[in-house]
């Protein structure tokens, strides 16, 4: 994606300062010596000018926020470090295809003996980019068309449109994203969408047409998202043999909800971490801003990771949640929690744990799930240092429960009910990390604590996703 160049400067000593981990895109500093060089690496320097080559529709003010720290550098090492950091910030905006940095001695009548000029050579993304692909899954084929307008108004705004035309369903989504200048983590987005989901474990089809607006911002070591969503939901039966409980849920509803999520994440990787912790807490309040659906929903996710000897990693995770209906109406099948499957309590079929009617799983208003995991390198370390590092041997123990609570009873009764009829499983398998995108698991599972009505997957189970218990 580019290189930091230093011109008319002596090469850095081999024992020079450590730049730290500069990211996957960082490259070695390229030094181009010239005649009559002046040794500046150990002297104070002043960044007199910062130039940009290649700017078109990008506004100057948003650029100045990203490169202002370059002027604060006091020596050559700081200039090079802060120039690299500014380059990373510019790339993060998502408006440049390439960013190169050139550091040169200052020229001109106002040039100081220790003055430097920093030049950013940038290549902007095109005004319109597109993608086209096909997807096959769940006995359905679909064509997906995507369009993106990056840097729409010159300040890193982005408009994205995605249209999916399938043999069974058609979906679309339109979104507008705008970051705050100088603070990319503080951003605002608006989404308009229509999406259809099929849930065979419940014999249910759900079509959502909605609009949402959300604001994300960091505070100290946490990140927060505040969101409003208004959605028109249409529920229908997926098959003619759907249970009466599912048929009773069919029809239209309007949900207007306010939600807040807080995340504290110190993990070194979100897909297969070796160290660090994650805490995620979500709250959703529906009905206060309108609609005919009213509830209060709380859930959390906790994960701890510790690297042991011989590149072995121990991981512990805990999920939990509760849904409290408000008013006279019971909770909807579309809002309840579901449990079971290769990404939660392994050894059970997808979302096939807990309350059910005639083979259709109805979800629950309260749940918990926990897991203990041990990840080790492959035996004999094949492909060590290369492709083999993407694989891990996996040993696990999972447990959890899903049920409905009587909110007229006290907390002790709720805890007692959640502690009854615990489903649990253990097993071993292989994990494949697909970069920082997703991970695949192939496990041999032994389900235990099976209750009447649960659907199990005894033996080999395959899972793919980004969020695992």
From Swiss-Prot:
Keywords: Cytoplasm, Membrane, Methylation, Mitochondrion, Mitochondrion outer membrane, Transmembrane, Transmembrane beta strand
Quaternary structure note: Associates with the mitochondrial contact site and cristae organizing system (MICOS) complex, composed of at least MICOS10/MIC10, CHCHD3/MIC19, CHCHD6/MIC25, APOOL/MIC27, IMMT/MIC60, APOO/MIC23/MIC26 and QIL1/MIC13. This complex was also known under the names MINOS or MitOS complex. The MICOS complex associates with mitochondrial outer membrane proteins SAMM50, MTX1 and MTX2 (together described as components of the mitochondrial outer membrane sorting assembly machinery (SAM) complex) and DNAJC11, mitochondrial inner membrane protein TMEM11 and with HSPA9.
UniProt-listed PANTHER family: SORTING AND ASSEMBLY MACHINERY COMPONENT 50 HOMOLOG, SORTING AND ASSEMBLY MACHINERY SAMM50 PROTEIN FAMILY MEMBER
Modified residues (N6-methyllysine): 255
A Gene Ontology BP annotation from the UniProt entry: mitochondrial respiratory chain complex assembly
Official protein name in the record: Sorting and assembly machinery component 50 homolog
UniProt KW Mitochondrion keyword: yes
């Amino acid at each position: 994606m580019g290189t930091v160049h230093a011109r008319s400067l002596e090469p850095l000593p081999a024992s020079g300062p450590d730049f730290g981990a500069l990211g996957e895109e960082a490259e070695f500093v390229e030094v181009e010596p010239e005649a009559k060089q002046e040794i500046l690496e150990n002297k104070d320097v002043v960044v007199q000018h910062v130039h940009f080559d290649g700017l078109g529709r990008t506004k100057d003010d948003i650029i100045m926020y990203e490169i202002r720290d370059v002027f604060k550098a006091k020596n050559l090492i700081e200039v090079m470090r802060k120039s690299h950091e500014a380059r990373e910030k510019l790339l993060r905006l998502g408006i440049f295809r390439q960013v190169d940095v050139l550091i040169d001695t200052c020229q001109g009548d106002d040039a100081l003996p220790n003055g430097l000029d920093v030049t950013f050579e940038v290549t902007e993304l095109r005004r319109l980019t597109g993608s086209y692909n096909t997807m096959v899954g769940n006995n359905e084929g679909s064509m997906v068309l995507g369009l993106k307008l990056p840097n729409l108004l010159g300040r890193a705004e982005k408009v994205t449109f995605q249209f999916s035309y399938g043999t069974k369903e058609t979906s679309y989504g339109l979104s507008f994203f705008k970051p705050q200048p100088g603070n990319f983590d503080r951003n605002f987005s608006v989404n308009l969408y229509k999406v259809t989901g099929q849930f065979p474990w419940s014999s249910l089809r759900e079509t959502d047409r909605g609009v949402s607006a959300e604001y994300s911002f960091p505070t100290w070591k946490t990140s927060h998202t505040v969101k409003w969503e208004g959605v028109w939901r249409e529920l229908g039966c997926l098959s003619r043999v759907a249970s009466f409980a599912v048929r009773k849920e069919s029809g239209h509803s309007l949900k207007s909800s306010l939600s807040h999520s807080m995340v504290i994440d110190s993990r070194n990787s979100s897909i297969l971490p070796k160290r660090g912790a994650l805490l995620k807490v979500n709250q959703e309040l529906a009905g206060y801003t309108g609609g005919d659906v009213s509830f209060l929903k709380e859930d959390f996710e906790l994960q701890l990771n510790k690297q042991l000897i011989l590149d072995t990693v121990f991981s512990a995770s805990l999920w939990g949640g509760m849904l409290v209906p408000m008013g006279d109406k019971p909770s909807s099948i579309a809002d309840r929690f579901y449990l079971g499957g290769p990404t939660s309590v392994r050894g059970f079929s997808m979302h096939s744990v807990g309350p059910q009617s005639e083979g259709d799983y109805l979800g629950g208003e309260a749940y918990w799930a926990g897991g203990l995991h041990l990840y080790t390198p492959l035996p004999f370390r094949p492909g060590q240092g290369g492709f083999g590092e993407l694989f891990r041997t996996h040993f696990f123990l999972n447990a959890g429960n899903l049920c409905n609570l009587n909110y007229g009873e006290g907390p002790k009764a709720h805890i007692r009910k959640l502690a009854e009829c615990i489903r649990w499983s253990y097993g071993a398998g292989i994990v494949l990390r697909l970069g920082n995108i997703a991970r695949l698991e192939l496990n041999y599972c032994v389900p235990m604590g099976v209750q009447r009505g649960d659907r199990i997957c005894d033996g080999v189970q395959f899972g793919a996703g980004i969020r695992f218990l």
